[in-house]
């Protein structure tokens, strides 16, 4: 690749020395360690200056900012420290605060005249440094509260989104895209954020950028003539190259590319499934029930035949419902009434609560511009966020979510029942017809030769039965446990599916009876979490179990 690798802001001079005993000898070490009493002594008794740098050119205010000591920072400012004073590379205290996400210090600096857009020799502002270190909360804070420019380029033309993509900070990418950062920006080397994510092999970063972007970003070439997919392939990231190439084909207008990528637009495979159902009904009526070379239909066979046809018609009705029904789309920002003077929706996120912090950043949807519910997921095919997202089913050309899961479950139950009964009736019909079979002729040969329509029906029907039974069993098990297909597939990634002890725990499992009752009555299972015992109680319980086993 023609472009040189991005050089991260040097943090070598910002590390606090490790050691058991802290040797506070001057205002700089006192500021770095937050020793307020010694700092006051140095300033008020020893008359030490807070406006001069140390031997390396760094200021006391920078050290206090790096380690998030707001009271120390306030004292330094009140006693001669310049809030906008910069070091040899023109970095201010705000740059240092951004390295470790020191939000409290940032408030002190900016409320005392600090310049939020101050840039160092590389053109890095605080927003760039925050993106380089993945300090999503800090970045959001200075953007929401102090109107920092989150899309500003540095001297090389790279925005914070370039940096977040290069470093692979998925939450920071989500935040920037949520705030409409321009992902089509090319730096001096012609690289977009997607180029940098592909270069480093960051699959999650690439996925977020592709889902939130357009086909133009996939086709952009850098100055060396490489697209993101070609860069990924050149660097040996074959899985990313395959993903990007597939995404590019899916967004192509060429129908051949769409078929190769498995994306057939909004239609999906629903017409195929509907055709299979109609073919099965046609074969069942003409080749099984009304075939002239089969025995006359008895009353019992006729009753079960009509029952099977009724179930099949019911499955078509439910197929239409779960295909056309809203699966639980969450309203997008554009669908909501917007008040230009309203408060920033991300300003009041509680960063002191670690569970809320983690959940909120991962819940930002940069495409729909919403803070989605915990069990919600963005579907790249439907291009919408779905409540209680289970999976996207190409056979119904729709997602399965909170509002259509009951219809989907009824549909597959009806499909299972009708295919099972139809197979039994078909076997019974040909078995009865084989009573006149010649001794020298095998039963299988007789059926294939004399009743090819029944054979074709049974082959297709058995395939449908196996698929429908497997899906029905899986869905029934998940409904009983109040967990979705998506949650089972991503249980390691989702923090809310881990208990206080770090092991898998489903916070929504209220017991089989309640889960099933909620699903049957309301059409969806409950989203209310059950309370977990505190970690100490879990530890005591675990030790008790170990002692009992030992005894």
Predicted stretch roles:
Residues 235, 245, 249-392, 396-551:
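Membrane-associated feature with strongest affinity for ZDHHC
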Residues 43-48, 74-81, 107-114, 140-148, ...:
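Ankyrin repeat domain, specifically the short helix-to-loop turn at the C-terminus of the second helix
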Residues 20, 54, 87, 120, ...:
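Ankyrin repeat boundary/linker residues
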Residues 38, 71-72, 104-105, 137-138, ...:
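Conserved ankyrin/ankyrin-like repeat signature
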